[in-house]
Amino acid sequence: MSAEVLKVDAANPDPRVLRYAAGWLNRGAVIAVPTDTLYALAADPVNLSAVEEIFRVKGRPESRALPILINSLVYATILARDLPDNFFRLAEACWPGPLTIVVDASNRLPLKVTANTRRIALRWPDSAIVSNLISELGVPLTGTSANISGSPNCASAVEVFTQLGDRIPLILDAGQTNDAVPSTIVELRGEHWCLGREGAIPAGQIEAALGGDEAVPA
């Protein structure tokens, strides 16, 4: 069965479409949604069977953790533990936006989400679709890229359908995303940090936000 493709306005998403998408997520499905960078595979990260389905759909090694999309700092404080001051400085400077911050995880999610590392990758995208869908569902979402592992990232619903149209039930189509560059990844350990990946936010902007905090090799 091929995926259903539903058009959605990126700036003003129809609540009925999001309610329909949330229904799929509540049933443990994996769906594709546009973010402020690329399309992502969204699922309920608390539902272990949904998490396992993501790894199956992508062909993703279970040794790789799943990023989590949030729409408030409240979720960050629930899903992470002992957040350092530099986390909040980065969040204030770059969120909502294309920054993923890796911190110590709490015990609120299945270990498979963190690949048994007890570290969690959090992102608050600048996306009304993602933010409103999280609010509709009542929990954060997984946010791994909507592609087959090792294949090109997808910046449009057409590209997602080409790769995953026979593996997922629903794709929300907001057209081409604004930025085909993935998010920047910063890892925090206490007051030390390292750049895991330079993406849509340049390294200089991260350094400016963190001031005099010491960077360590990745």
Question: For each of these PLM feature ranges, what is it?
Answer:
Residues M1-A218:
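Active-site-adjacent structural elements in enzyme catalytic cores
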